[in-house]
């Protein structure tokens, strides 16, 4: 594993929902593919009613510990059905889900969450959790969305070109190599890019058509990763459109969509880029969001 800052495990948040079960399956396959241990965690949190107490009442605690134990035991059995030799550990915590997962992100290669499918309210809550983890966590986060993608579907990565470095491109190459599938690198621009509005110059000589200049940006961003992963077949796509629109279109044909936490025009201190937010809430396939160098 060569992803910068990568940890040594795949961590999945477990709550027993159908979306969580999908996340466990996805996380188990990812851990097996990357030869990493799988950690299944459940944080039930202490309700506000007990906030002033050192520990909640014993009957409440016992009931929640038993529930967590059953949830995690079922999730571990599910993971072992996918790979009987996979190292799996489980952890229940009094911490709430977000504090627990942020803490686990310190040593995780990736955090994995499920989506809620048909439940709009639950999906909103999970989306909020994912956004919080994308902002405060220290590892990439995958939200497992959509149906079961075809095994030969490509990995798709959004390439910005403005960031001083885009480590998620390397992560996308690694994921495509592990799956032995094509990588589609999508670079999208429009006439209202914030970078242009603030005077950043993309073509200092003013001679190349915009399309040629943007294609050069894409090729330059991919060049070092093509050298590092020569076995990965790459399709480079440069288009004039809204980034979120085209990436969401591609999500219907991909098995994994990879993006940075902030894109062009992203400023230090902003919570999360609008494109990353749209992908977390609306992607039709699992979406992996990696932190921007500005974070």
Annotate each PLM feature:
Residues 2-58, 154-205, 226-237, 295:
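Small/aliphatic-rich secondary-structure junction motif
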Residues 112-115, 141-146, 287-291:
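Short beta-strand elements of ligand-binding domains
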Residues 34-37, 86, 139, 181-182, ...:
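Short glycine/serine/threonine/alanine-rich loop segments
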Residues 1-6, 19, 59-62, 77-111, ...:
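Structural beta-alpha unit
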Residues 113-132, 152, 256-282:
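Glycine-rich, Arg-bearing micro-motifs that act as flexible, cationic patches
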Residues 182-261, 268-270:
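Structured core of small recognition/catalytic domains
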Residues 58-70, 204-214:
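A short acidic, glycine-rich active-site loop
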Residues 129-147:
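Short, structured interface segments
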């Amino acid at each position: 594993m060569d992803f910068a800052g990568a940890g040594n495990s795949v961590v999945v948040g477990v709550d027993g929902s159908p979306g969580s079960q999908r996340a466990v399956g996805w996380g188990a396959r990812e851990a097996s593919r990357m030869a990493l241990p799988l950690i299944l965690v459940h944080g039930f949190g202490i309700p506000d009613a007990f906030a002033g107490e050192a520990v909640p009442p014993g009957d409440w605690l016992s009931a929640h510990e038993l529930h967590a134990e059953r949830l995690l035991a079922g999730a571990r059995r599910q993971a072992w059905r996918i790979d009987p030799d996979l190292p799996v550990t489980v952890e229940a915590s009094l911490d709430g889900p977000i504090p627990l997962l942020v803490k686990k992100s310190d040593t995780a290669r990736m955090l994995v969450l499920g989506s809620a499918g048909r439940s709009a309210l639950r999906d909103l809550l999970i989306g909020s959790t994912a956004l919080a983890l994308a902002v405060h966590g220290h590892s990439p986060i995958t939200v497992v969305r959509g149906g079961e993608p075809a095994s030969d579907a490509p990995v798709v990565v959004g390439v910005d070109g403005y960031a001083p470095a885009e480590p998620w491109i390397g992560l996308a190459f690694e994921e495509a190599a592990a799956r032995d599938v094509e990588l589609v690198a999508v670079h999208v621009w429009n006439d209202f890019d914030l970078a242009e509005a603030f005077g950043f110059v993309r073509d200092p000589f003013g001679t190349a058509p915009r399309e040629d200049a943007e294609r050069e940006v894409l090729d330059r961003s991919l060049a070092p990763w093509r050298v590092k992963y020569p076995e990965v077949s790459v399709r480079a796509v440069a288009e004039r459109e809204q980034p979120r629109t085209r990436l969401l279109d591609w999500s219907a044909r991909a098995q994994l969509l990879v993006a940075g936490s902030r894109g062009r025009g992203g400023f230090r201190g902003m919570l999360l880029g609008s494109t990353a937010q749209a992908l977390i809430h609306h992607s039709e396939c699992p979406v992996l969001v990696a932190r921007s160098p500005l974070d």
